[in-house]
């Protein structure tokens, strides 16, 4: 296909020359060049044309007239979203395994793209330093803390274990109590890997909660396997994944109460927290007073991986861990989200691509909102059936529970006959 000239005219009457292949849908060209559909009007041979249906033709005169005043071309070149003559040629670095990019705003409002390349050794040091700095700056671990460490055996919780082991001398003295909810959607192989890794860390107090513990916690009539399969088949992946995570957290909270320890640590990384905040903003609720450290009823949730992305965790494990610890199998049917969940991760990843480091702005904005506007903490209750701590932050208008003495999931399970209306008194 021949290349064809497309002219982009900005609000300062500057003309930017782009090229598109004949036969290409213009909507595809716009997406490939990071030109938002609603930022331009399309003129073909001086006539307004629908940019979503037009196909680029060789002899047509195509002009994209920006209706927005921001400097799209300048921004795209700064971020290297456009790789044309206005962008410095990228020099190959065969030693580099990773480039960290952050969009940095100066006091005059102009932004710069800061980026650093890492080889294997410098990358491991960078992740170790980010991990320690993230814990110390937010006081996630204090001297003589006891922390319940929830482990699935997946890549995120394994990376957390390796980071704790490698940097233990740089952190305040603390005691870890490991727990894995086994025989549910977690595979036997994952549980084995979790046990190996926690032994390497030197954690003496580690418990694998069996299926009987799960069924006892939830008061299932027909058992976990039947319940989760029924929910998956009848209500889909969105319901089954949230139910599974609720079951695991209910078991972890029960275990923590039995231990008398109320600091809970999960393997939530940068995107998990960024996505959670993004989703709560779209729903009109707030995640908590802080992304890496938040109050949840009688518990405190600690997320030591908050500064590190999933990609960085994966690379880190590939370097520092044996192969059978760095590999991750496909998620089970019960651990796959639906579109309502996945689109939030997708949008968060896209936003990080066009605004590198945006997630950190979200984290700080959440803390400022709570501090400056003195937002009241949501009301928390404890489910009469499973014992999980839950919030009323969604509001009464979205509360569809038929049975108000239990959490949303247990109310639903009572309705379909998978748990009794009232748990037995021991």
Q: What role is predicted for each listed range?
A:
Residues 108, 116, 380-383, 404-407:
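Residues immediately within or flanking Cys/His clusters that coordinate Zn2+
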Residues 121, 385-388, 409:
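Short, cysteine/histidine-rich loop/knuckle motifs that typically chelate Zn2+
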Residues 394-404:
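Short linker/helix segments within small regulatory modules
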Residues 13-15, 19, 39, 50-97, ...:
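A broadly conserved sequence feature marking short terminus-proximal activation segments
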Residues 12-14, 30-32, 36, 48-50, ...:
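ATP-dependent adenylation/nucleotidyltransferase module used to activate substrates
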Residues 1-18:
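Eukaryote-biased recognition of intrinsically disordered, low-complexity regulatory segments
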Residues 391-392, 412-415:
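Short functional micro-motifs and their immediate structural scaffolds
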Residues 272-353, 415-416, 423-426:
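Catalytic subdomain that performs nucleotidyl-dependent activation
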């Amino acid at each position: 296909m021949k290349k064809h000239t497309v002219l982009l005219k900005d609000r300062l009457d500057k003309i930017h020359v782009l090229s598109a292949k004949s036969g290409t849908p213009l909507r595809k060209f716009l997406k490939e060049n990071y030109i938002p559909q609603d930022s331009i009007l399309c003129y073909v041979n001086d006539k307004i044309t629908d940019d979503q249906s037009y196909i680029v033709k060789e002899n047509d005169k195509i002009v994209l007239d920006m209706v927005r005043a921001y400097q799209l071309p300048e921004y795209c070149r700064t971020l290297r979203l456009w790789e044309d003559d206005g962008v410095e040629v990228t020099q190959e670095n065969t030693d580099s395994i990773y480039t960290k990019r952050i969009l940095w705003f100066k006091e005059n409002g102009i932004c710069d793209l800061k980026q650093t390349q890492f080889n294997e050794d410098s990358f491991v040091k960078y992740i170790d330093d980010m991990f320690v700095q993230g814990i110390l700056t937010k006081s996630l671990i204090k001297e003589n803390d006891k922390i319940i460490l929830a482990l699935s055996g997946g890549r995120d919780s394994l990376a957390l274990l390796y980071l704790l082991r490698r940097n233990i001398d740089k952190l305040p003295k603390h005691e870890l109590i490991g727990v894995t909810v086994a025989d549910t959607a977690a595979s036997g192989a994952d549980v084995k890997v979790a046990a190996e890794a926690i032994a390497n860390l030197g954690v003496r107090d580690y418990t694998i909660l069996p299926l009987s513990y799960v069924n006892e916690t939830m008061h299932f009539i027909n058992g976990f396997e039947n319940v989760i399969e029924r929910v998956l088949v009848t209500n889909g992946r969105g319901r089954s994944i949230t139910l599974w995570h609720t079951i695991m957290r209910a078991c972890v909270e029960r275990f923590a109460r039995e231990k008398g320890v109320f600091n809970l640590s999960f393997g939530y990384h940068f995107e998990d927290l960024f996505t959670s905040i993004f989703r709560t903003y779209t729903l009109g609720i707030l995640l908590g007073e802080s992304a890496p450290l938040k109050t949840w009823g009688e518990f405190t949730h600690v997320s030591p991986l908050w500064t590190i992305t999933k990609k960085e965790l994966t690379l880190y494990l590939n370097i520092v861990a044996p192969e059978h610890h760095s590999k991750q199998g496909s998620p089970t049917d019960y651990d796959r989200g639906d579109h309502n969940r996945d689109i939030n991760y997708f949008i968060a990843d896209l936003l990080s691509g066009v605004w590198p480091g945006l997630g950190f702005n979200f984290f700080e904005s959440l803390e400022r909102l709570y501090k400056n506007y003195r937002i009241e903490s949501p009301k928390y209750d404890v489910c009469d059936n499973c014992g999980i701590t839950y919030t009323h932050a969604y509001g009464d208008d979205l509360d569809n529970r038929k049975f108000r003495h239990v959490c949303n999931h247990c109310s639903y399970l009572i309705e379909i006959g998978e748990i009794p209306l009232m748990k037995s008194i021991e």
